[in-house]
Amino acid sequence: MIGRLRGILAYKQPPWLVIDVGGVGYELEAPMSTFYDLPDVGRDVILFTHYAQKEDSVSLYGFLREGERRLFRDVQKVTGIGAKIALAVLSGVSVDEFARLITSGDITALTRIPGIGKKTAERMVVELRDRAADFSSGAPITGQLGPDAVSEATVALQQLGYKPAEAARMARDAGAEGDEVATVIRKALQAALR
């Protein structure tokens, strides 16, 4: 329903933040991994979102990186895990670290994440191992000029068929402070042809 929001960061106090989009304040819940990289209040921000509706509530979750949102959704597909534990996972470890823990089957490290016991960790390893390679943190989406161009170029490169991690690396390597999105994309594609 709501896949992405771009607006002014009006409020941030973990785990809640508010983004003003055209005069409407969207309240979102976000993991600490998102809070670490948020710009200051009053600055532009772009967040990937996940909309969840239950019988008695509607929730909106925000993530700076597409890989975080993807992981949030995949973790909730594991039997017995909901949004609260999925947020705890993203607040406790990076997407890349989580993928490593799942791939290696490190049950002990997974149980250090709040809300995850041994049986849940074992279920996570079994149910997510095949998808762990697809997890990628990607580049953060922010409203600042340089990073914004790099982030938007990352999304564009993904739409051209590049994997999220590869697209993020290409855009980051090609981008310079103040570059336009088209410039970053052009430089990234030229570098890929060399």
Curated annotation (Swiss-Prot):
Its main location: cytoplasm. Gene3D superfamilies: 5' to 3' exonuclease, C-terminal subdomain (1.10.150.20), DNA helicase RuvA subunit, C-terminal domain (1.10.8.10), Nucleic acid-binding proteins (2.40.50.140). CDD domains: UBA_RuvA_C (cd14332). Residues 1-64 are annotated as: Domain I. It holds the Pfam family HHH_5. Disulfide bonds: none annotated. It comes from the Bacteria. Keywords: Cytoplasm, DNA damage, DNA recombination, DNA repair, DNA-binding. Residues 140-144 are annotated as: Flexible linker. Has three domains with a flexible linker between the domains II and III and assumes an 'L' shape. Domain III is highly mobile and contacts RuvB. This is Holliday junction branch migration complex subunit RuvA. The gene is ruvA.
